[in-house]
From Swiss-Prot:
Histones H1 are necessary for the condensation of nucleosome chains into higher-order structures. Keywords: Chromosome, DNA-binding, Nucleus. Residues 124-177, 185-211 have a biased composition (Basic residues). One of its GO terms (cellular component) is nucleus. Residues 17-91 form the H15 domain. Residues 1-22, 81-211 are annotated as: Disordered. It comes from Strongylocentrotus purpuratus. Pfam families: Linker_histone (PF00538). PANTHER family: H15 DOMAIN-CONTAINING PROTEIN-RELATED, HISTONE H1. This is Histone H1-beta, late embryonic. Residues 95-107, 114-123 have a biased composition (Basic and acidic residues). It is found in: Nucleus; Chromosome. SUPFAM superfamilies: Winged helix' DNA-binding domain.
Amino acid sequence: MAAEQKKVAKKPRAKPAHPSSSEMVLAAITALKERGGSSAQAIRKYIEKNYTVDIKKQAIFIKRALITGVEKGTLVQVKGKGASGSFKLGKKKEGKSDAQKAPDAAKKAKLAAKKKEAKEKKAARSKAKKEKLAAKKASKKTTKKVKKPAAKKAKKPAAKKAAKKPAAKKPAAKKAAAKPAPAKKAAKKPAAKKAAKKVAKKPAAKKAAKK
C-alpha cells in the first residue's frame, strides 16, 4: 500500500496557468514603457488583462514581487514607499553595469593569457624535440660519412692484387724468348760441309795409283 501511495504522489504536477508574480510584474513594466515609472495599480490592471489570474488572491504576491524587485535591484522605486508608488526596471535587468563588466573582462583576459602561455610552452617543447631529433639525425649522418672511407681503403688492396697478376705471365714470355736456342744448333750445320771437303780430298788416292 505504501508503494502505491508513493506512485500516486509521483504524478506530474499540473502546469501553472500563469508565470510567477515577479515575471508578470517585469512584463507589465516593460510593456507599459512609462517614463515616470508604472504605478502599482497600472501593473495590476495589466496582469489582470493579459493573464488568467484571480487578481484579489494575486495582489499579495504582486506586492511582494515589487518589494523584492527593489531590494534585488531589478526594479527601481521612483515614487512612494513599500509596494505603493511607481516603479521602473533596474539597471541589472537592462544590462550589467560597467563595474560588473570590469571583473568579467579581467577574468577573460587572464584566461586568454593562460591559454597563450600554455600554447607557447607547447610550441617551445615541440621545437626542442624537433631540434633534438635533427641533432640525432645529423650525428648519424656524420658517423656514416666517416665509415665510408674505411670501406674504400679495404677495396684498394684488391685492386693491387689484380695489378700483380700480369707479373706472373712474364716468365712465360722469357720461355718464348729462350726458344731461339735451337737455331744455334742449325748454325752448326757447316760441320757437314767439312765432311764434304773430306770426300773431295779422296782423289789424292788416285794419284797414288798412277805412280
